[in-house]
A protein has these predicted regions:
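Short acidic-glycine loop/turn motifs at beta-strand connectors
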Residues: 52-55, 92, 123-130, 159, ...
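Short, solvent-exposed aromatic-acidic interface loops
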Residues: 62-68, 136-141, 195-200
């Protein structure tokens, strides 16, 4: 089983090679892995996709309201090779509650209520993917040259270190939930990751601190938390849903939730 020490990890293989994690090719240089581990005195199931930044393009796709659908459906609709669910949204209206820019169109704004956890941006320009720590709602000024931008949070890692010395005591941060995050390495890899949860003894989920440590184990230098809970879903064109989304309260691949946006690669 995996063991994780709370030390800085750098380089794409630094936290992986010694544990025998196997990556499977899913096309165009992208790879997928499924990791089962005993971490933090809990059972963790981690699904990950990684790809060389120079080989593929990331996009933010936003289809809110009546157009919202499962992550897999959004991915297929937009011709994705792989996809993960996006950021926070209103469960009743299926409208985003964080800033969204898709193909230079601003399609959502961060509400004041969401600022307690939304402190970062996933910004895409061409094949370049950046994670930006941003403590202002003036996102457009910070990302005016980026056609695709998604606000989310909290930022988990910056430059290989946990983004905060101490996390807030709110249950969103301290309780174990399914988590989704996106991250980058300094040697040019981009990761999409889901930590399964709400399946005691099979997938216990992670706190935000534990999520940041898992990101470090994967060798990430920068990482941004996305929407989690029942939204957390990781999908590939070749394998379908590879995580275990929990909106059906079962530990299987069928419990997807309708979401308004997703992060795709193609």
């Amino acid at each position: 089983m995996l063991a994780l020490a709370a030390t800085a990890v750098t380089g794409q293989e630094a936290g992986l090679g010694r544990y025998g994690v196997r990556w499977t090719d899913i096309g165009k240089g992208a790879q997928a892995a499924y990791i089962q581990a005993e971490l933090f005195g809990s059972r963790q199931c981690i699904s990950a996709i990684r790809y060389p930044e120079k080989r593929l393009r990331m996009r933010i796709v936003n289809d809110p309201g009546s157009e919202a659908d499962s992550t897999s459906a959004l991915a297929l609709r937009h011709g994705a090779l792989a996809a993960v669910n996006g950021s926070y949204f209103n469960m009743k209206t299926l409208e985003p509650v964080t800033f969204v820019k898709e193909r230079r169109r601003i399609e959502g704004g961060t509400t004041r209520r969401e600022t307690f956890r939304t402190d970062g941006l996933l910004a895409v320009r061409g094949r370049k993917v950046d994670i930006i720590r941003c403590d202002t709602l003036n996102y457009e000024a910070a990302t005016k040259r980026c056609p695709d931008v998604l606000a989310a949070g909290p930022v988990l890692l910056m430059d290989g270190w946990e983004a905060r010395d101490e996390w807030p005591s709110d249950s969103f941060y301290t309780s174990r939930h399914p988590r989704t995050f996106v991250g980058t390495t300094r040697d040019g890899w981009v990761y999409l990751v889901v930590i399964d949860g709400r399946a005691p003894g099979k997938a216990d989920g992670a706190s935000i601190h534990e999520t940041a440590l898992i990101a470090r184990l994967l060798g990430l230098d920068n990482a941004l938390n996305l929407d989690g809970g029942g939204s957390s879903t990781l999908w590939t064109r070749s394998g379908g849903v590879i995580s275990n989304p929990c909106d059906n309260r079962r530990f299987d691949h069928s419990g997807q939730r309708r979401v308004p946006n997703a992060v795709i690669i193609r």
